[in-house]
Amino acid sequence: MWMGKKGATDEQIDEALEISQSKEFVDSKQGRLDYVIEQGGKNLSGGQRQRLTIARAIVRKPDVLILDDSASALDFATDAALRKAIRGMNNSPTVFIVSQRAASLMYADLIIVLDDGKVAGMGTHDELLANCEVYKEIYESQFKKADSEGGVA
């Protein structure tokens, strides 16, 4: 965690772990923050690695936070909790999210939909559902998949 911000306080680290949905699994590790992570994070799951990376970014309190497919290894419920926590941050940063998961973008001020490298649509979630067939197809296919898996889209 100190790779994100040297000299970060325990409170700052705990806040970043809470927001990134990492606190529970970090608290379960022997030694907690002194737990040794192997080269490449081999002793962590993909979702744990992603959440710790997000925590390291959050602990810096950036003005701009870029999340590039940051939830690909997270289940739908954890992804939703992460998005909600980021929206609720004090002095919330400007967040750019690159995602193939439509649910990760639902509350964005502006969504840009790309199809074969070209802009297929721009707008809010509701605007795109009404006016962009590419976005609507992606959203509906992912929403049906989440329902069948018992998750939240």
Segments the model singles out, each with a brief description of its role:
Residues 99-101:
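Conserved H-loop
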Residues 23-52, 67-70, 74-77, 144-153:
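ABC-fold ATPase nucleotide-binding domain signature/coupling loops
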